[in-house]
Amino acid sequence: MLRWLKTIFAKIVYLMTEKDFFSPPYPVSKNEGKSIWKAPSNIALIKYWGKKENQIPANPSLSFTLSSCATTTIMEYRRLEKRGTNFDFDLFFEGKPMESFRPKIETFLKRIEVYLPFLKEYHFKIETSNSFPHSSGIASSASGMAALALCLMDLEKELNPEMEPDFFKKKASFLARLGSGSACRSIEGDLILWGADQDFPESTDLYAIKYPFEVHEVFKNYQDTILLVHKGQKQVSSTVG
C-alpha cells in the first residue's frame, strides 16, 4: 500500500533540473549590502562515500544537523565600477586573513558562476567563524559552504525579490553542493536526505531535501557527542572515499 501511494505521489512531484537554477535577467540592481547566515554542520547516519563528476554522490545519504556545531558567515558586497575578469574577494577566518582557503573558494565560485552571473560584478568581503575546529572531521566544509551559499542567495534575492522561499532553499542547497557535497545537507534541518532513491520520489542528486516521512519519537531527541582528541585535519575525505 505504501509503495503504491509513493508511486502515485511520484507522478505529481516536480523534480528540478540544472536548467531551473539558471538565473533570469534581474529586475533590480543593488550597489552594496551585507548578509549574515549561520549554518549547522551535519553528521551522516547513512554516509555517501565517493562522488561522480559534478559533485554527484555515489550513493544517497541521510544526516542529522548538529545544533551546537555551526559556521557563521558575514558577507559584505560592493558593486564594482566595471565587471571584473576574475573573482574579487577578501577572506577572513576567525578574524584573520586566510589565504589557504582561497583556492577552494575560487573553485566554488567558478562552479556556480553560471548560476549566479553577478559574481564578477561585486567585491566581496567574507568573514567566517566556527563553533568547532575546522577540518577535524566535523564537516566544517559543509557548514562553511552552506553559510556562504545562503549569503550569496540573499544577494540574488535582493536582485530578484519575487523569488519563492522554497526555490531559495533548493537553490542554496544546489549551490552548496558544488562547494562541498555534504554542504547541501546543511541548509536546513533536522533529518536530511541527499541523493536520488527510488523509494523517495522527491529525492535528487542535485540538492538535499527534508526526510519526507514520519520519524520515530526516539530520533527526535537524538544526541551526538563529539570528543576531540586532536585538532589536526582528517586524513581521508568523503570525496576520496
Question: What is the predicted function of each stretch?
Answer:
Residues 126, 134-186, 190-193:
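Long, hydrophobic, well-ordered secondary-structure blocks that form the structural core
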Residues 164, 168-241:
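ATP-dependent small-molecule kinase catalytic core of the GHMP/sugar-kinase superfamily
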Residues 5-136, 150-161, 165:
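ATP-binding N-lobe of GHMP and related small-molecule kinases
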